[in-house]
């Protein structure tokens, strides 16, 4: 599960860059 955290953070960061 912990291995999915960096991926989730990267996804949120990528989305946040559009705003």
UniProtKB/Swiss-Prot annotation:
Transmembrane segments: none annotated. It is found in: Secreted. Its main location: secreted. GO terms for cellular component: extracellular region. Shorter peptides due to unspecific cleavage of this peptide have also been identified. The modification Phenylalanine amide is found at residue 19. GO terms for biological process: innate immune response. Expressed by the skin glands. Keywords: Amidation, Amphibian defense peptide, Antimicrobial, Immunity, Innate immunity, Secreted. Antimicrobial peptide with low activity against Leishmania species (L.amazonensis and L.infantum). Shows low cytotoxicity against mammalian cells in models of peritoneal macrophages. Belongs to the frog skin active peptide (FSAP) family. Phylloseptin subfamily. This is Phylloseptin-N1. It comes from Pithecopus nordestinus (Northeastern Brazilian leaf frog).
């Amino acid at each position: 599960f912990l291995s999915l955290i960096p991926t989730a953070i990267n996804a949120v960061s990528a989305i946040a860059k559009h705003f």
